[in-house]
Amino acid sequence: MTQVTVKELAQVVDTPVERLLLQMRDAGLPHTSAEQVVTDSEKQALLTHLKGSHGDRASEPRKITLQRKTTTTLKVGGSKTVSVEVRKKKTYVKRSPDEIEAERQRELEEQRAAEEAERLKAEEAAARQRAEEEARKAEEAARAKAAQEAAATAGAEPAVVADVAVAEPVAKPAAVEERKKEEPRRAPKRDEDDDRRDRKHTQHRPSVKEKEKVPAPRVAPRSTDEESDGYRRGGRGGKSKLKKRNQHGFQNPTGPIVREVNIGETITVAELAAQMSVKGAEVVKFMFKMGSPVTINQVLDQETAQLVAEELGHKVKLVSENALEEQLAESLKFEGEAVTRAPVVTVMGHVDHGKTSLLDYIRRAKVAAGEAGGITQHIGAYHVETERGMVTFLDTPGHAAFTAMRARGAQATDIVILVVAADDGVMPQTQEAVQHAKAAGVPIVVAVNKIDKPEANPDNIKNGLAALDVIPEEWGGDAPFVPVSAKLGTGVDELLEAVLLQAEVLELKATPSAPGRGVVVESRLDKGRGPVATVLVQDGTLRQGDMVLVGINYGRVRAMLDENGKPIKEAGPSIPVEILGLDGTPDAGDEMTVVADEKKAREVALFRQGKFREVKLARAHAGKLENIFENMGQEEKKTLNIVLKADVRGSLEALQGSLSGLGNDEVQVRVVGGGVGGITESDANLALASNAVLFGFNVRADAGARKIVEAEGLDMRYYNVIYDIIEDVKKALTGMLGSDLRENILGIAEVRDVFRSPKFGAIAGCMVTEGMVHRNRPIRVLRDDVVIFEGELESLRRFKDDVAEVRAGMECGIGVKSYNDVKVGDKIEVFEKVEVARSL
């Protein structure tokens, strides 16, 4: 060991000797001069003192933190690299002696507790073993006694008594024996170790002789708690996992399980399979066998799903998914005083029979002049105050395209005025109006119009309508016939009187104090005001600010206008109004109801939208599958695509129905887009993408749409009369049909003789019997009226002169191109092919 003096140590640590001596004295060292020797232990004591004086009393640091940093380079691609730096930090903490002592004490406590638990378990095992030994001895004694009694008496009765007597004490060992039979020991080595460990702590250890005398005791089954985690408590290892029997927790059913399947209006294949507890693939396979190829996510309608479930042997419960609708209907029930309301009268009849003119006279306003082409193309709703009371009129279109509008008018009405022109008679739309009125169960009042014309024949009208089961009152029927003239006003008062008389008979009632309820007559999209719906209030009172639910649309009534465009605050029964504030244009015929709050309205509207979409998808797919073979040749059809925009919903429906009905097996019309309102930029883009024609019915295109139409050269047309659209589309379809080639026979020549020519070969000397024979036209050679050759007439001569044509009754020589087998008696037929335009 190297000895260092105080002076040398001061030089090493770079401190004055006096200061070092002072520090050594403070540390309790005996050094007083610079020449004294300092040992290593004294250096350590001095260092410890200095650390303590600087605030660290511990001889070693309690916490050490090590930091390590590694940098690697990662190639990203090409010559580009990225440096990746990984920093790791570890902290080591030295525990104090107090903590070490506390942990040691805790370990000792745990060890003592474990030994105590082990001792208690050993005592329990010994007690259990003694109990089993006693039970075994009792069983053997009972058996020996039973055997003695059986030998002593031959009767079976004592034996039975003995069995009954010992049944109770041997119940438990019998169960043990049964379990041993069922469950062979799978791990003998482990069981022997457990037994040896259990017997280790027993107090009584028998000698070798006793072991020879006493038979080996039965091993008691270790009881495990049925609801435990499957571990056996006890033993040195804490808990050991028991071997469980490899047995399923359920058994296969002996028979088919019939389940109750709830089916709503629509259900997917996957949902149906889940309710029947079968795999989706099974249902798909079954439906393939039924002839309906489906996918697992396909929506089935109620009837199809019911058929599948019943075929698979399950009970079907048809569920109504209209809980929201039922709640809404329940909330709309209102009791109040009913009062007499004005009748709603629909004016129906054939086109140009004077319906609007009659209304015009009643209203004292010129309505018909405002209609395009003088025909009605919307349902107009008006209410008129007469001397005998108020009457609400609905004016329906008479054109064939507006069938749905007329049906809608009949459903919303109380009385139908059937207008028939006295000079025209019963026409197709007249018959249709009668059918709609009878289907709706509405009484008919016949107005025989235009009686001021000299050719008017009212009796002819009565005969024609009697054939449709509309019997005049004077013939014993119930339909009043009133002759009127909308031009002169003749009979109009009598007509109104007849209408009001019918209304009195019907006893029409309404409750004005109830929330408003009605039907949508018409709807349109106004550029400045948004969706506008014409509503006929049928019951209750509709007020401005009410929250209304209309089909799949809802909204708050922001404003109400009467038929003259004047704002009103409320509308009672039988009053037609225009309402603003809906979130979309409802379909004509949708029911309008006033609901309590916006939340309820939104909830029901969203429910209806989802339901409508599901049903539509299900029906569309079913239609595709049913017509799969019919549609195999559809791709060969030529299609005229149309984007159609109209001013009101009713006209749009009428046009879509009429245009879709046009076409035949070769051409068809497809309305790729339709809507209410002006032609927008998106409509123009749709027409561009689908190669469609843009039709605007009483609407115009905005600036953006016009720009696209001009730039892309799209075909855009405006119309205000429905006839014109239908006629133009028919012409377009006719043009798409192309033309047919038709053959016209020009003439027939009979072969009288055959000559040979070195230039043309066989020349037929003929007599033209019919028509005219032309050179360079296609011909047919007929022998016994059977075509044997078809070719071209190459040479035509008369008296050695080439001619262009030969008339009937003249002789000529005919040379047939590439044909020499002409015989006397053959006929040569000259014809031409003409293109003929086809029509629908």
UniProtKB/Swiss-Prot annotation:
Q: Does the keyword Cytoplasm apply?
A: yes
| Chief location category | cytoplasm
Q: Where are the annotated segments for Disordered?
A: 95-155, 172-256
Residues of the region (G5) are 485-487
Region span, G2? 374-378
Binding residues for GTP: 349-356, 395-399, 449-452
Residues of the tr-type G domain? 340-509
Which portions of the chain have biased composition (kind: Basic and acidic residues)? Answer: 95-143, 175-191, 223-232
**Gene Ontology terms, cellular component aspect?**
cytosol
Give the UniProt subcellular location, in the record's own words.
Cytoplasm
Give the span(s) annotated as G4: 449-452
State what protein this is by name. Translation initiation factor IF-2
Q: Which organism is it from?
A: Pseudomonas aeruginosa (strain LESB58)
Identify the taxonomic lineage of the organism of origin.
Answer: Bacteria, Pseudomonadati, Pseudomonadota, Gammaproteobacteria, Pseudomonadales
